[in-house]
């Protein structure tokens, strides 16, 4: 859960991309992760945080092997469930359920990704954010700027002395 959540928070990876992630997509020595493109998204090579590299190494070399041995599964996918199901959505449903225990307002993983991209737009330029988010079209990234503008308008209404 910690690794999956970290990939969503630090790299803005979508659920579908997490489900498709295979061992050869991890470049742990270089501290990078390769996200394969799809019909909707562009592929991209993203930097991992230092703690993510260690966590992923531990997961791939120890925990994942234990899960595969215990369940008798064979898979090239990075993430696999502990149960008999091969369905990745079960993993994500469990993650969202456990996150909701701490934050009741959380709707889904997309909500976290939206916050991540909105934050990236505050830090990076539009094109870099587009690349990092894997958006094929810049208009997809620009939609998050509108999201940010709406937040600013709400703040103005809330805190402006005349408003």
Which ranges hold each PLM region?
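Short, polar N-cap/turn motifs at the start of nucleic acid-interacting alpha helices
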Residues: 26-28, 105-106, 125-144, 150
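Active-site/catalytic core of tyrosine-dependent DNA strand-transfer enzymes
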Residues: 49-104
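Conserved tyrosine-mediated DNA breakage-rejoining catalytic core shared by Y-recombinases
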Residues: 11, 15, 20-55
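Basic, Lys/Arg- and aromatic-enriched nucleic-acid-binding interface segment
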Residues: 1-15
């Amino acid at each position: 859960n910690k690794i999956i959540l970290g990939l969503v928070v630090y790299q803005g990876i979508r659920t579908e991309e997490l489900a498709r992630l295979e061992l050869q997509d991890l470049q742990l020595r270089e501290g990078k992760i390769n996200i394969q493109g799809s019909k909707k998204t562009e592929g991209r090579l993203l930097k991992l945080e230092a703690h993510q590299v260690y966590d992923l190494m531990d997961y791939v070399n120890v925990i994942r092997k234990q899960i595969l041995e215990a369940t008798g599964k064979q898979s090239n996918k990075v993430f696999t469930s502990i149960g008999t199901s091969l369905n990745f959505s079960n993993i994500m449903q469990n993650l969202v359920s456990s996150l909701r225990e701490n934050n009741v307002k959380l709707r889904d993983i997309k909500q976290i990704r939206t916050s991540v991209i909105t934050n990236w737009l505050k830090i990076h330029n539009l094109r870099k954010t587009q690349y990092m988010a894997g958006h094929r079209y810049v208009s997809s990234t620009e939609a998050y700027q509108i999201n940010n503008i709406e937040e600013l308008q709400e703040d103005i209404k809330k805190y402006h002395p005349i408003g």
